[in-house]
């Protein structure tokens, strides 16, 4: 399994002959190494409906005939735009040919702001547990710290956790360090920082808050192998 980070909250997983993208916000992402027009994917997983997470989903999905897996409301909304979707909800798991997806709770919000100043409710925000090849990745999406992260860690043997550290809209570094402890992941990678001024952070400072060898700040385009 190959896992790559592409700035903000964009994660790519290559496993079982498939390419899975999580939260493909590329156009307008000041930290990414990708060009949306060149991105290939078989599956897109979405944590919630904010623009900096849905991003280029529709374009990428249509061009690649990719399946989009998201919460029911968000999946329904995207299906109306001609995208193949599979709707799920928090606590539910589903085994696909590329791996198993389970949605967890997240403490955030989820909605799309239209050009005519309307807000479309798109269901609850989530984190994602993805399991394939005997490895489990937890992408927390956008969230504050919550005590059930302990339960997530107890119920799942997490190999890699992607945790937001930007503050303002999500956990900051200190709370994310507590989350890392509760989750008990073997490796913790910071996400959702330095894309916009309100979420400016030093990822190495976050890494320094964790036990030696647990944290690793990936540069956009950098990969790890499991």
UniProtKB/Swiss-Prot annotation:
It comes from the Bacteria. It holds the Pfam family Lactamase_B_3. SMART domains: Lactamase_B (SM00849). InterPro entries: Metallo-B-lactamas (IPR001279), RibonucZ/Hydroxyglut_hydro (IPR036866), UPF0173 (IPR022877), UPF0173_UPF0282_UlaG_hydrolase (IPR050114). SUPFAM superfamilies: Metallo-hydrolase/oxidoreductase. Keywords: Hydrolase. GO terms for molecular function: hydrolase activity. Belongs to the UPF0173 family. PANTHER family: UPF0173 METAL-DEPENDENT HYDROLASE MJ1163, UPF0173 METAL-DEPENDENT HYDROLASE MJ1163-RELATED. This is UPF0173 metal-dependent hydrolase GK2750. It comes from Geobacillus kaustophilus (strain HTA426).
């Amino acid at each position: 399994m190959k896992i790559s980070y592409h700035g903000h909250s964009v994660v790519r997983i290559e496993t079982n002959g498939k390419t899975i993208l999580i939260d493909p916000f590329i156009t307008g992402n000041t930290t990414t190494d990708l060009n949306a027009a060149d991105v290939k994917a078989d599956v897109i997983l979405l944590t919630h409906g904010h623009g900096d997470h849905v991003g280029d989903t529709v374009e990428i999905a249509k061009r690649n005939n990719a399946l989009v897996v998201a919460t029911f409301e968000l999946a329904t909304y995207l299906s109306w735009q001609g995208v193949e979707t599979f709707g799920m909800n928090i606590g539910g798991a589903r085994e696909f040919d590329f791996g198993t997806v389970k949605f967890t709770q997240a403490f955030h919000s989820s909605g799309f702001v239209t050009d005519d100043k309307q807000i479309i409710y798109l269901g609850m925000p989530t984190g994602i547990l993805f399991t394939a090849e005997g490895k489990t990745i937890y992408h927390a999406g956008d969230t504050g710290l919550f005590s059930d992260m302990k339960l997530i860690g107890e119920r799942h043997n997490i190999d890699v956790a992607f945790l937001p550290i930007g503050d303002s809209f999500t956990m900051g570094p200190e709370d994310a360090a507590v989350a890392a402890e509760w989750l008990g992941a073997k490796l913790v990678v910071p996400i959702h920082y330095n894309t916009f001024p309100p979420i400016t952070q030093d990822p190495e400072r976050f890494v320094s808050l964790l036990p030696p060898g647990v944290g690793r700040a990936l540069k956009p385009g950098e990969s790890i192998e499991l």
